[in-house]
Design a protein with these regions (language model features):
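Feature 926 captures the class I aminoacyl-tRNA synthetase adenylation module centered on the KMSKS loop
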Residues: 2-3, 231, 444-519, 523, ...
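Residue patterns forming the tRNA-binding/recognition surfaces of aminoacyl-tRNA synthetases
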Residues: 2-11, 15-16, 24-25, 29-33, ...
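Positively charged, low-complexity intrinsically disordered leader regions
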Residues: 22-46
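Amphipathic alpha-helical
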Residues: 27, 193-220, 253-256, 478, ...
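N-terminal catalytic cores of NTP/NDP-binding nucleotidyl/phosphoryl-transfer enzymes
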Residues: 41-103, 185, 245-248, 287-319, ...
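Short, solvent-exposed turn/loop segments enriched in Gly/Ser/Thr/Pro and often Arg
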Residues: 42-44, 53-54, 89-100, 173-181, ...
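Active-site-adjacent bridging/hinge elements
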Residues: 44-52, 74, 125-133, 158-165, ...
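Protease-associated
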Residues: 237-301, 309-314
Length: 885
């Protein structure tokens, strides 16, 4: 909840204002006062809940993080000032591959589940340069190192967020590997399993040979890589010559199960139903037809191998072909010769490939094909997109493996349509981002693969029975009771068994895999919102009001959260989704730790100050990629400093007046009458230019409020900043002399300036929280961030009916005076001997109301107004006093 502005009787304005030290001063005060603490007793309709993205804990934050999290914070601060009780938690995404890789490199260790736990283990003092020399440690020791290092990283992250001024409630935190997250993640998975939404399948899956794990479609990325088309001769079984295919993966000829062409391709229609034998190995395979074959690609005929790419998987499934895989999970060709190679020549040939990695096997295969005469012509060099795991270093392979999946519409058109419709329940900022969400769903080719063959993550919470012959029955998973969660099947025994039965006949085995980190991150609303332990809180915060995130993870975090909410709650998980763009380096490439082109924000915050860095970030429009530009931080620092100094100037009028009332030259008279300074209100604003300025302030409030209601923090800042500079450069200069006086005109100037300052500070507060809080403390009680958002009603109608064009007319005259002095290379306090304004009488009548202010601001000795014909332009003539010296 918020309070109305409470002005103290006399401002306390410092002799000099500075930005240095404000972060520490106000950060400590906000924490001590609980300024941003969420009130769980607030009614549900007063709550504004944010599904804060938990940053990945795998090193350090970069300016891209500062960029997007500032956007969220601006929105949170605005909502809090409008009276909403803001639920703004912070999580840390500390499990998964990035964390494991950081721990491996930091300590020089690698996880080996066959190694026994060492309770006294101490990691090496220095990590070896070569990963092959990393020390093998037990799974438990490895997890302990992960917990230790991520805990240290999280403290650094929190310190940076606090310095940036994020108005997070730091009592509402979690990590994606803590007990609460593991319990929520496992319970949600078991609910999916009970409803038939989670299932296990032994099927082809994308496989990263470096990390030795399966990956999902959402984690794939195409990278351009050199390659070559090789024309291979398959021999027709009828002896009528060869059928030539072009392939970029000649090494997979050993895994070929068929040749395929488009059913309408006249070249191959006579061959459909016939067979050919493969080069080198002499394996007979059929020639088949399928609509996905491209007549324009290569020779129009292609190998179906198990498995070269995802199209191979489709062909294999739909044409019911056999599986003949030779590439193992280690990325090497099988050591044993496959049974389907029956000829002695073929078996001898395979011995040259056994145990080789994919690249070596390709080179060897090409050499063998050249020697056999079955490679036709020279390879045609190309560059083509190759599938990689987004965090991987080697091209993905497709291997057969048993994995867990959650249904996501990739194989269910009805579910896909339901998820697309859920997108309509969300207001997208910017709107076009919904198209990316829809396009992703429409492009899915399978369900969500959630199991990972790694160590630091939430364990798949099931066991499998072992029969009397020692065979594992994967079709009858044993689930734990909900009250026992979280569990680790690698160290806990299922109900009804004891540890001695692990791996024994009539015993059990635990599922060795963990869940993909997105499987847990997809439940951030449930984790933060108390889904399984605080039902009253959950009812208040869900569906959440806002999901802020980067646009590149729509396919992962946003979509996966939508899937889990749709399946469990039957609703979209949020009302709004605000998408931030990327930060680009000077080469217009996305900044990322993996690319090594990031800028660490710590030094920027120290050099420019937090408000300046926030200013740079808040200028990035929603959904738009933005180039890193340190010069904008310098502009932001100048703005924050101007806010301090302009506020000192404005409050100096009131301080001077108030101190005079309390004990100035007329102190005796005032003491006798009991007179004291009293804050001036809107009713004191009587001067036409002051009223016109407040009319502009009222319009600004409406514009900025509308921008924030549309989650457009950038437009809100842009409009506020533009008005502020005009306010200090023109209006303040115009009225300052009048404000120093002691008459009705002075009261009008001071009252209007205070009203404008109070409003502008609050409009700036979401973007510049430290400078605005500092100024607010000089003359107002309480925190500006718990004070109500400005409204036009606060202005008391002072601007109603004001001459809206008067400020621009006065500014035009003042501009000409300043321009003349600048061109004459003289100071602004140089006197003007004669100022003449020529304009139609109607304009002159309006300018007459600000004659005194123009004379004071321009240091004018003689001011003449010359009427012209109606419709003529306003012209200004300036004659300066000549310095005879």
């Amino acid at each position: 909840m918020t309070d109305a502005p409470r002005r103290r009787s006399t401002p306390t304005v410092p002799a000099k204002a500075a930005l240095e030290g404000l972060e520490d001063k106000w950060g400590e005060r906000w924490e001590a006062d609980g300024t941003y603490r969420f009130d769980a007793n607030a009614p549900a309709d007063a709550v504004f809940s944010i599904d804060t993205p938990p940053p990945t804990v795998s090193g350090s934050l970069h300016v891209g993080h500062v960029f997007s999290y500032t956007h969220t914070d601006c929105i949170a601060r605005y909502q809090r000032m409008t009276g909403r009780e803001v639920f703004y938690p912070m999580g840390w995404d500390d499990n998964g591959v990035p964390t494991e890789r950081r721990v491996e490199n930091y300590y020089g260790v690698r996880c080996d589940p066959t190694v026994h736990y060492d309770a006294a283990f101490v990691p090496p003092e220095k990590a070896p340069k070569n990963r092959r020399d990393f020390l093998a440690v037990s799974r438990r020791n490895f997890i302990e190192l992960c917990v230790q290092l991520t805990g240290e990283d999280e403290q650094v992250f929190e310190a940076l967020w606090r310095r940036l001024g994020l108005s997070v409630d730091w009592t509402q935190t979690y990590t994606t590997i803590d007990e609460r997250s593991r319990r929520v993640s496992q319970r949600a998975f078991l609910d999916n399993l009970a409803r038939g939404e989670a299932y296990q399948a032994d099927a082809p899956s994308m496989w990263d040979i470096t990390f030795r794990m399966a990956v999902s479609q959402a984690e794939l990325e195409d990278r351009p890589r050199p390659g070559a088309y090789h024309d291979l001769a398959f021999h027709r079984s009828d002896g009528e010559g060869d059928l030539v295919v072009s392939t970029t993966r000649p090494e997979l000829v050993v895994s070929c199960v068929a040749l395929v062409a488009h059913p309408d391709d006249e070249r191959y229609k006579p061959l459909f139903g016939s067979t050919v034998t493969s080069p080198l190995f002499g394996v007979e395979v059929p020639v088949v037809a399928h609509r996905l074959a491209d007549p324009e690609k290569g020779t129009g005929a292609a190998m179906i191998c198990t498995f070269g790419d995802l199209t191979d998987v489709i062909w294999w499934r739909e044409l019911d072909l056999p599986a003949r895989a030779v590439i193992g999970r280690d990325g090497r060709f099988a050591a044993d010769t496959p049974a389907w190679i029956e000829s002695d020549t073929g078996r001898n040939t395979y011995e040259a490939l056994a145990g080789l990695g994919v690249k070596a096997a390709q080179r060897t295969t090409v050499e063998l094909l050249e020697a056999s005469g079955e490679l036709l012509g020279e390879p045609k060099v190309i560059e083509h997109p190759v599938k990689f795991y987004e965090k991987g270093e080697a091209p993905l392979e497709i291997v057969q493996s048993r994995q867990w999946y959650i249904r996501n519409g990739g194989r269910d058109a009805a579910l896909a349509e339901q998820l697309i419709a859920r997108g309509d329940e969300v207001t997208w900022h910017p709107l076009y981002m919904q198209t990316r969400y829809t396009n992703w769903i429409e492009g899915l080719n399978g369900d969500w693969l959630i199991s990972r063959q790694r160590y630091f993550g939430v364990p798949i919470p099931v066991w499998y029975p072992v029969d009397a012959d020692g065979e594992v029955n994967y079709d009858a998973p044993i689930a734990p009771d909900a009250v026992t969660l979280p569990v680790d099947p690698q160290s806990d025994a299922p109900n009804g068994y004891d540890e001695a039965q692990r791996g024994q006949p009539n015993g059990f085995v635990g599922d060795p895999d963990i869940m993909d980190t997105w499987a847990t991150s997809s439940l951030t609303p449930q984790i933060a919102g108390g889904w399984d332990h605080d039902h009253e809180l959950w009812a208040k915060v869900f569906p959440m009001d806002l999901r802020p995130q980067a646009h590149d993870i729509i396919r992962t975090w946003l979509f996966s959260t939508m899937v889990r909410s749709h399946l469990a709650e039957g609703t979209a998980p949020w009302r709004h989704a605000a998408l931030s763009g990327w930060i680009l380096d000077p080469d217009r490439k996305k900044m990322s730790k993996s690319k090594g082109n990031v800028v660490v924000p710590t030094e920027l915050l120290q050099q420019h100050g937090s408000d300046a860095v926030r200013y740079w970030a808040a200028n990035g429009r929603p959904g738009t990629d933005t180039a890193f530009d340190e010069t904008q931080m310098k502009v932001g620092r100048r703005l924050a400093l101007k806010v301090l100094n302009a506020s000192r100037f404005v409050l100096g009028f009131s301080q001077r007046n108030d101190q005079s009332a309390d004990g100035g030259d007329d102190a005796a008279d005032q003491a006798a009458t009991g007179a004291r300074a009293t804050p001036l209100g809107a009713d004191a604003v009587t001067h036409p230019i002051d009223r016109a300025m407040l009319a502009e302030v009222a319009a600004l409030v409406e514009t900025v409020t509308a921008a924030f209601e549309e989650f457009d923090y950038a437009r809100a800042l842009e409009r506020t900043e533009a008005f502020f500079w005009n306010f200090v450069d023109v209006h303040l200069e115009l009225v300052k002399t009048r404000a120093y006086r002691d008459d009705d005109g002075s009261a009008s100037a001071r009252a209007s300036l205070e009203l404008a300052l109070s409003t502008l500070l609050r409009l700036f507060a979401p973007h510049l929280p430290f400078a605005t809080e500092e100024v607010w403390s000089w003359w107002m009680d309480g925190s500006i961030h718990r004070t109500g958002w400005p409204t036009t009603a606060e202005l008391g109608g002072a601007g109603d009916g004001a001459d809206g064009e008067l400020p621009a007319l006065a500014a035009q005259v003042l501009h000409e005076v300043r321009r003349t002095k600048t061109e004459a290379r003289t100071g602004m306090r140089t006197a003007v001997r004669r100022l003449e304004v020529s304009a139609p009488p109607e304009l002159l009548d309006r300018l007459e109301t600000v004659r005194g202010d123009l004379v004071d601001a321009g240091v004018v000795q003689e001011f003449e107004m010359t009427p012209t014909d109606a419709g003529a332009d306003l012209t200004v003539s300036v004659e300066l006093v000549v310095d005879d010296a």
